[in-house]
Amino acid sequence: MHLRGCACHLSLYCVYNDWENKIYRVPIFQCLFLEAETRSLKTFLIRGQSLDQESLNEIEVTRKETMLWDLQEQSNMMDKKIAAISSLIMNNGELLRKLSKFFVPLTVVLGDDGLEILEAYVCGEEPMLPLDTVPVILRCVGDYAALDTKHLLSNECTQASKKLRFGYSVMDFHFSLTVSDVKICFSHTDTGEAVCEKMKQIFYFSVCAFGGEQVLLVTPKNAYALLFDDDLCLLLLQSVFAFLHEKIFAVYKQVLVQLCEYIGPDLWPFGNERSVSFIGYPNLWLLSVSDLERRVPDTTYICREILSFCGLAPILGPRGRHAIPVIRELSVEMPGSETSLQRFRFNSQYVSSESLCFQTGPEDTHLFFSDSDMYVVTLPDCLRLLLKSTVPRAFLPCFDENATEIELLLKFMSRLQHRSYALFDAVIFMLDAFVSAFQRACTLMEMRWLLVRDLHVFYLTCDGKDSHVVMPLLQTAVENCWEKITEIKQRPAFQCMEISRCGFVFYARFFLSSGLSQSKEAHWTVTASKYLSACIRANKTGLCFASITVYFQDMMCVFIANRYNVSYWIEEFDPNDYCLEYHEGLLDCSRYTAVMSEDGQLVRQARGIALTDKINFSYYILVTLRVLRRWVESKFEDVEQAEFIRWENRMLYEHIHLLHLN
């Protein structure tokens, strides 16, 4: 029997022993398959090749066994475990390799039972996106067992890791699964029969014979992804699926029990990417979404997100990614190993070696001031065009031309470097060659190179030139360099912003710049950047305290107007970089949102709840004034500097209480 469609998800069902045929450690895989003709989802099984005992031991390492007091050893053990899991799924035969290329059109050959996939043939390059499906949305609340906070005082690992070491657990919980307009509520007190009846509203249950055993296939009716909010505690998430798994298989006692093993960032002592995977049950994608209460992503975005993984869920590591070939030869010579590209980092992204860029730790601070005009050149789709010309269509996420998807593009780029070395180097080399050519053109125009952000935003400074002359020259330089280096006919969209007579950059825990002064985003860094730009521009020849007072009061008015606006104040932080106050749940093991507290620690702040009373508004004002003070120190004499400090103290005394009024 032949069936046309595409694989939407692939996982392990279990590893079992075929006692009758004396075949041991046989992995059974399950594939969630979208049939093209009926547009319906089906679950098929694949019989894998027998494992050796060593590989099985690495896969079966328990959480308790990984909780070592040597943190680096714990991290290494988890790396070995996910490497073994990924290798099992990706390298257990050519058939599984084909099925792990999600949304690629396939024709599968089924066995006589219509249950087992025996072979698969690729029958197209254009991704077959299941756009008529809808995601399952998980929401959950619960209570936790009390934990002595003295166990959490040290900073050697994340708070989540320390909690798990000391037996942190969920006492009770309630959750709901929502598909379209169907919402099903569950409680930890539900019986197995009640759970199965509820689950059958959105999942098909079927018991089938396979390899001399009975297996239970749980197939979503019209979904291949489950979404949960970034701010959902990962311990609650684990509890939900452990509960569902236990209750379902307690009812279906006669079947071969499916695995249900959680892999998430809290299993690493220093945290990991915000990604989750269950080996076994459930057989669908679990995706973390920011601010899910207010914005449910559409199916197209979910497909792009999955394609950007380049294979399995990111938490399963580099071995869970495909080696993607390059679809065109470069006309310019690639550098050899001795002259390989030097890649520096700024804002956690790779940038050209020709740019001035920063390698910052959590407490590093970088400042730049200039009396020159600053130009910010943005090429929002340059990465998309480069990837489109080098990545095979079947592997390329269908990125929109909208610049808001730059974060997804950058994540896709970063994942290419682990297995798709030639492709990653080709894209980076073309980008580096283009940036180098653009830099030389800017130098000929007597413009100074400052930095590159996120591979597509270029900061430059220039003296005494009319912007009506400079901007067309910059656009011409971009277009000529692009056409010459990349040989891509479509030119990147060009955006250029001029900030006259004021150029500054401040980078520490956050980014302030005159380049943000024209942004319409509602965030304190934008307001602070506008204030600093106005002060620097108005006081180039002398320090006028009347003007900086007016600008300061304008800034305070905006701060006060956003007093209760959570998104205005929160920042994102990497796990284990800063000291974080105690909070309920496991919420700091991946990148998280927080605000600064009165005692200098971060306070975990979710997007969907009211702003914490512990926020220290003074911190944000002081940081802004600190940047302005550094500018005063670089520009004026000791007398003005002393007067500025007195003015600064007075402003704080007169205004800070306004932010704390209810």
From Swiss-Prot:
* GO CC annotation terms, alphabetical: host cell nucleus
| Function recorded in the entry | Component of the helicase/primase complex. Unwinds the DNA at the replication forks and generates single-stranded DNA for both leading and lagging strand synthesis. The primase synthesizes short RNA primers on the lagging strand that the polymerase presumably elongates using dNTPs. The primase-associated factor has no known catalytic activity in the complex and may serve to facilitate the formation of the replisome by directly interacting with the origin-binding protein and the polymerase.
**Pfam families per the UniProt record, alphabetical:** Herpes_HEPA
GO terms, biological process: DNA replication; viral genome replication
Disulfide cysteine pairs (residue numbers): none
| Keywords linked to the UniProt accession | DNA replication, Host nucleus
Q: Where in the cell is it found?
A: Host nucleus
Q: Which family does it belong to?
A: Belongs to the herpesviridae HEPA family.
Q: Per its record, how is this protein called by name?
A: DNA helicase/primase complex-associated protein
Query: InterPro entries in the record, alphabetically?
Result: HSV_HEPA
UniProt-listed HAMAP family: HSV_HEPA (MF_04010)
Subunit and interaction comment: Associates with the primase and the helicase to form the helicase-primase complex. Interacts with the origin-binding protein. Interacts with the polymerase catalytic subunit.
